[in-house]
């Protein structure tokens, strides 16, 4: 059994890691950490795990964690993971970092996040559909939630060198703001409302740019605007991709199905994607339509921000890092409606 630890287990992504790992056939949950809740039952904050999990929060040092765990998931705030990674990797422990600390080139991270990086090392960007090489790695940077939905929507056309301009419009559920309420996630402000924010300068844009330009080096005109909607889970992305040549919807079907051949978590529903059809699952549902008059392609993608956008994707990476099938412990339908 793979002994797993979660650093920062009291938040939403930590709780989702616990939920998905508790029944994983190849994993034993070894520890869950929280500085402020050390000694208290994990189920005191994650009540949905009552009867499934008998663990107390701990606050061990990195050496103790490294000695007890085969894999560690870092579900900590941006700027904190870099304090753990050097010691955790000083041995045979594998690490999946769910923060932004290692997703970008160091100079880009410091510019976007305004944090001086104390451990500038490279990590594979853990979007398995683009980077299957995670299977050979001990350290993986798990992608952000918005970039996951956006990149997967555009990657086939970017890889074919067909995109001239990309415009991503994403709607996210409230859980994307984290466990502490903010003005945008406070119920009276968001109920029956939609709140756009960081219209031109959201920091997740840097990941989208990095990955799409990695597929097509000349693609530079990439735009991203997020909105919060009164839903608990999910990210729905509408990608307006202006192409260098006129494409038909049949062309798109061929390009997308070929690009995502043998990628089990990419689905092409018969209609448009919906958040309820992916909620609680690790799937990314994608549909597309060609606008020949304007050389535009509209691609829709739907993911659960806490699963494929965070914890499920982290476990998908872990599976490959340990030589397991990537679907292990994750092959389940959504919780619709």
UniProtKB/Swiss-Prot annotation:
Catalytic activity field: N-acetyl-L-glutamate 5-semialdehyde + phosphate + NADP(+) = N-acetyl-L-glutamyl 5-phosphate + NADPH + H(+)
Location of the active site: 145
GO cellular component, one term: cytoplasm
InterPro entries the UniProt entry points to: AGPR_AS, AGPR_type-1, NAD(P)-bd_dom_sf, NAGSA_dehydrogenase, Semialdehyde_DH_NAD-bd
A GO molecular function held by the record: N-acetyl-gamma-glutamyl-phosphate reductase activity
Pathway it works in: Amino-acid biosynthesis; L-arginine biosynthesis; N(2)-acetyl-L-ornithine from L-glutamate: step 3/4
Location(s), subcellular: Cytoplasm
Primary location group: cytoplasm
Keyword presence, Amino-acid biosynthesis: yes
Any one of the GO BP annotations: L-arginine biosynthetic process
Domain of life: Archaea
Enzyme Commission number, as recorded: 1.2.1.38
Top-level enzyme category: oxidoreductase
CDD domains: AGPR_1_C, AGPR_1_N
The UniProt record lists the keyword Amino-acid biosynthesis: yes
Gene3D superfamilies (alphabetical): Dihydrodipicolinate Reductase, domain 2 (3.30.360.10), NAD(P)-binding Rossmann-like Domain (3.40.50.720)
Keywords: Amino-acid biosynthesis, Arginine biosynthesis, Cytoplasm, NADP, Oxidoreductase
A Pfam family hit: Semialdhyde_dhC_1
HAMAP family with a match to the protein in the record: ArgC_type1
Similarity comment text for this entry: Belongs to the NAGSA dehydrogenase family. Type 1 subfamily.
Function noted in UniProt: Catalyzes the NADPH-dependent reduction of N-acetyl-5-glutamyl phosphate to yield N-acetyl-L-glutamate 5-semialdehyde.
Protein name (record): N-acetyl-gamma-glutamyl-phosphate reductase
Lineage of origin: Archaea, Methanobacteriati, Methanobacteriota, Stenosarchaea group, Methanomicrobia
């Amino acid at each position: 059994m793979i002994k797993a630890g979660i650093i920062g287990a009291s938040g939403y992504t930590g709780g989702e890691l616990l939920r998905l790992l508790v029944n994983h056939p190849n994993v034993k949950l070894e520890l869950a950490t929280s500085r402020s809740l050390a000694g208290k039952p994990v189920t005191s904050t994650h009540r949905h795990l009552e009867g499934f999990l008998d663990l107390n929060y701990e606050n061990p040092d990195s050496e103790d964690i490294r000695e007890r765990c085969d894999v560690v998931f870092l579900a900590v705030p941006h700027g904190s993971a870099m304090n753990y990674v050097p010691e955790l990797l000083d041995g045979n422990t594998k690490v999946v970092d769910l923060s932004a600390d290692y997703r970008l080139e160091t100079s880009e991270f410091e510019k976007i996040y305004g944090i001086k990086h104390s451990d500038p090392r490279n990590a594979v960007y853990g979007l398995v559909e683009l980077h299957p090489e995670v299977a050979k790695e001990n350290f993986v940077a798990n992608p952000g939630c918005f970039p996951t939905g956006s990149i997967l929507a555009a990657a086939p056309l970017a890889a074919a060198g067909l995109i001239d301009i990309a415009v991503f419009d994403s709607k996210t559920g409230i859980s994307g703001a984290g466990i502490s309420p903010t003005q945008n996630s406070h119920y009276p402000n968001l109920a029956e409302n939609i709140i756009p924010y960081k219209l031109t300068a959201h920091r997740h844009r840097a990941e989208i740019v990095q990955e799409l330009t990695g597929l097509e080096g000349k693609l530079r005109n990439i735009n991203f605007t997020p909105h919060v909607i009164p839903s608990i889970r999910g990210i729905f992305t509408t990608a307006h991709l202006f192409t260098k040549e006129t494409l038909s919807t049949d062309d798109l079907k061929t390009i997308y199905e070929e690009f995502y051949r043998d990628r089990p978590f990419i689905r092409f529903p018969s209609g448009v994607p919906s958040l309820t059809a992916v909620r609680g699952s690790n799937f990314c549902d994608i549909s597309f339509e060609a606008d020949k008059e304007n050389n535009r392609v509209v691609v829709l993608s739907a993911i659960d921000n806490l699963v494929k956008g965070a914890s499920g994707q982290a476990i998908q990476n872990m599976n490959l890092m340990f030589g397991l099938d990537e679907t292990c412990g994750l092959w389940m339908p959504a919780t619709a409606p």
